Amino acid sequence: MSHWLGVYKISNEEEGIICAKKIMSLKENLFLLQEYCSGHDFRIVVLGDKVIQAYERVPFQIIGNGYDTIETILKQKVASFQLAGRDKSVDSSDSRIAKNIARQGYTLQSVLDPGVVCRLQDIANLSLGGPTADKTADISSYYQHLAIKIAQSLNLKLCGIDIIAQDITNPDNKDYTILEINSAPGLDNYVYEGQQQDNYVKRLYSMVFDFLEKM
């Protein structure tokens, strides 16, 4: 399924049954169950023998301002995504959003105090509204070498390696889980955040093209 449609974090048997029925309604006859791995979600992009990008993917969340309801802030967020040309798979009526709001003791009509964070998705993904936090300048040598070794073992010149870890900037933190290796990683995760980030994405693609020309 694309854009994380039909992907759910299940906390108990009852939720599992509900989610299974939702997936079946999408005419899917195959279920993939995966063990939940705790930690933060990172992607490390390798080009040749170098890490050119590393960032943390944060689940979609909103921050209270003391006067707007969760529903109002959510709709404003979705509207801003669409105005910027960001993927429209961010849907304010997504049942997973309602579940997360309720899990934290709120409703759509709740007004959060200024600075209070309400997580709306469990999944840390750009297509579901999640922001990113750049770690390229801070990733530890341990995780750089790990990512490069993985890419080389698969004979991939360009790839994105998805890792769950507590902190890829801490060289002493070596507890991690490899989620996925993507042989065609997108590099435009910052492009919606401003002109400076847009220029950064263009530089990344220039690096890739220069590398390919020299092969």
Q: Positions of the model-derived regions?
A:
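Active-site nucleotide/adenylate-binding loops and adjacent lid/helix of ATP-dependent enzymes
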Residues: M1-S95, S140-H145
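Generic hydrophobic/packing signal
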Residues: H3-Y8, Q53-Y55, I97, I101, ...
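A long amphipathic alpha-helix within ATP-dependent nucleotide-binding catalytic cores
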Residues: L26-K27, V78-T169
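Active-site flanking residues adjacent to catalytic metal/cofactor-binding acidic residues
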Residues: Q34, I161, L179
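Generic preference for flexible, low-structure residues
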Residues: L47-D49, V58-I62, Y67-I70, I163, ...
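C-terminal active-site "lid" helix and adjoining low-complexity regulatory extension at the edge
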Residues: T132-S141, Q152-L156, A165-M215
